[in-house]
């Protein structure tokens, strides 16, 4: 076991605070509409430019082990806030730094760290309750766009695009962000359920120009096994021919005689038909077939359920308004499934999302949920260079998370104003003793930190701005750093999601409380470099002893 180095009390806290300051100072320059960028060197490829707090925090690793521990604890604040709310990472870092700084001073002055932490926790609970009570639901599409715009660093185009995407696919729908090939940022919306399997044979194509299969009002046969023999298929094919409607077969695989017969019938014009492989693999395939069955009002033909293909009638088949099949994917638009059954299925998938511990499974379940609930939107982010595209993609991701958070828990005035005005909730807050009272005061001061930092990044005096906002009785009154004027934040469209503000404060206080109560730190002792080795130490290398001190 390697030797360890141990630091105690003031020495430990001072080193730790230095690490906190280095990380927080690098992150906080990005806060607000006039926040600056940070350039990060990459071991390969071009440097990365970002204005995203958590991206900066994740890149910082300090040489001093004790300083690094402090920095890593605050990095944890940014990561946790990013995971829970998707935005507000810089605010969380600024709050954590403010609480730790004041807390370390108080401990150095001889106050009890545990009581300080209890005071901090009391104050945070009161502030969170106050912020929640002032939160209001997002009512209009314009407000969704405003949240997106603020989070995307004032880029209105991004805010509008996210609002449009959410309007199209609903709040449950999946919105993904990709890098575009060109200069422009575009929005692609796929309405209905789409899965990544195309036609099994190009002979099924109905639109030769686009090489797609387009079928209106088709029957949909869902089969979980392979189809290779013709005999079991004949009864259902005859019924479909008599109905005069098209047929789409979705099965594990369609091959041999079955596929040949379908192709011949299609070419002779006796039957409009197309065959597609079922999406997914293993248990996920079964679940997705079940989803399609519920969406289209059909049944999965499965021998586990005792249903044989020979005994299938038209009532067991699903239907939809339209199906479009390309070489790569299939889109089912407007399935005729029962709305109650679809809602119940969505509820079931949501419960699985809550329970699962695997990120991969969660992502797949959310995709299934979106396909059932509304559709998929893809925002393709363009730019003049690869570096610019990556930087914009970071901002679009942030904006998307912030917008989802706003829809979930509502909005409060932005620009750090909600936290600054929440100071009033701490007046008359009962504490157990004088040390806890100091803990409450620490939070009272820390709540000003985001407003001060936003103002300072815009070239104004943070203390003056915070003082002026604090004097106002109007809880929406704040400072628009973009224009440099005091205004009603809600009317100016400067709004933050309640969830982001709440999560930032809770995560910051949680980690800061642990840092304040630290009394000893243990780190591995750095290994001493064995400089240029003298000749004598190279025993066993015969006559090469004299080469020990050479630089190669």
UniProtKB/Swiss-Prot annotation:
Q: Where does ATP bind?
A: 30-33, 51, 87-91, 415, 496
**GO CC, alphabetical:** cytoplasm
Q: What is its EC number?
A: 5.6.1.7
What Gene Ontology terms for biological process does this UniProt record contain?
A: protein refolding
Q: Which PROSITE patterns match?
A: CHAPERONINS_CPN60
Q: GO molecular function: any one?
A: ATP-dependent protein folding chaperone
Under InterPro entries, the record lists: Chaperonin_Cpn60_CS (IPR018370), Cpn60/GroEL (IPR001844), Cpn60/GroEL/TCP-1 (IPR002423), GroEL-like_apical_dom_sf (IPR027409), GROEL-like_equatorial_sf (IPR027413), TCP-1-like_intermed_sf (IPR027410)
- State the HAMAP family in the record: CH60
Q: How does it assemble?
A: Forms a cylinder of 14 subunits composed of two heptameric rings stacked back-to-back. Interacts with the co-chaperonin GroES.
The name under which this protein is listed is Chaperonin GroEL
Organism of provenance: Paramagnetospirillum magneticum (strain ATCC 700264 / AMB-1)
Q: What is the lineage of its organism?
A: Bacteria, Pseudomonadati, Pseudomonadota, Alphaproteobacteria, Rhodospirillales
């Amino acid at each position: 076991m390697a030797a360890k180095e141990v630091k105690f009390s003031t020495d430990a806290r001072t080193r730790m605070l230095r690490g906190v300051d280095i990380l927080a100072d690098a992150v906080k320059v990005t806060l607000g509409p006039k926040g600056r960028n940070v350039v990060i060197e990459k071991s390969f490829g071009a440097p990365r430019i970002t204005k995203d707090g958590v991206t900066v925090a994740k890149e910082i690793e300090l040489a001093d082990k004790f300083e690094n521990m402090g920095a890593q604890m605050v990095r944890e604040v940014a990561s946790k806030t990013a995971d829970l709310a998707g935005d507000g990472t810089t605010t969380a870092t600024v709050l954590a730094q403010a609480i730790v700084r004041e807390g370390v001073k108080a401990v150095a002055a001889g106050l009890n760290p545990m009581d300080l932490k209890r005071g901090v926790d009391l104050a945070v609970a009161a502030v969170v309750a106050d912020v929640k009570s002032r939160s209001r639901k997002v009512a209009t599409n314009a407000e969704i766009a405003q949240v997106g715009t603020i989070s995307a660093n004032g880029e209105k185009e991004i805010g509008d695009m996210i609002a449009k995407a959410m309007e199209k696919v609903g709040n449950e729908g999946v919105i993904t962000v990709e890098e575009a090939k060109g200069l422009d940022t575009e929005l692609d919306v796929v309405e209905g359920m789409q899965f990544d399997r195309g036609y099994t044979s190009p002979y099924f194509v109905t639109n030769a120009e686009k090489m797609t299969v387009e079928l209106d009002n088709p029957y949909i046969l869902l089969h979980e096994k392979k189809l290779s023999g013709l005999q079991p298929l004949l009864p259902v094919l005859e019924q479909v021919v008599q109905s005069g409607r098209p047929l789409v077969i979705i099965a594990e695989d369609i091959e041999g005689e079955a596929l040949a017969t379908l192709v011949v019938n299609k070419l002779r014009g006796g039957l409009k038909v197309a065959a597609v492989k079922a999406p997914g693999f293993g248990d996920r395939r079964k679940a997705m077939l079940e989803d399609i069955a519920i969406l289209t009002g059909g049944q999965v033909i499965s021998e586990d359920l005792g249903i044989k293909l020979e005994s299938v009638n038209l009532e067991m088949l699903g239907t939809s308004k339209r199906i479009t099949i390309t070489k790569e994917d299939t889109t089912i638009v407007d399935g005729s499934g029962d709305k109650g059954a679809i809602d119940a299925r969505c509820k079931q998938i949501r419960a699985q999302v809550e329970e699962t511990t695997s990120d991969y499974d969660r992502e797949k379940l959310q995709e299934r949920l979106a396909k059932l609930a509304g559709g998929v939107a893809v925002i393709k982010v363009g730019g003049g260079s690869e570096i610019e595209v990556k930087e914009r993609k970071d901002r679009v991701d942030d904006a998307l998370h912030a917008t989802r958070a706003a829809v979930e828990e509502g909005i409060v005035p932005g620009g750090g104003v909600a936290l600054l005005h929440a100071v009033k909730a701490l007046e008359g807050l009962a504490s157990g003793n004088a040390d806890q009272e100091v803990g409450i005061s620490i939070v009272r001061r820390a709540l000003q930190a985001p407003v001060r930092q936003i103002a300072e990044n815009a070239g104004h005096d943070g203390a003056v701005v915070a003082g002026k906002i604090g004097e106002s009785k109007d809880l929406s009154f704040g400072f628009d750093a973009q224009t440099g004027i005091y205004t009603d934040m809600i009317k100016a469209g400067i709004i933050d999601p309640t969830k982001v503000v709440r999560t930032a404060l809770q995560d910051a206080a949680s980690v800061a409380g642990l840092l304040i109560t630290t009394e000893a730190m243990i780190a591995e002792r750095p290994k001493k470099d064995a400089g240029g080795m003298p000749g004598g130490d190279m025993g066993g290398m015969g006559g090469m002893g004299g080469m020990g001190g050479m630089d190669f």
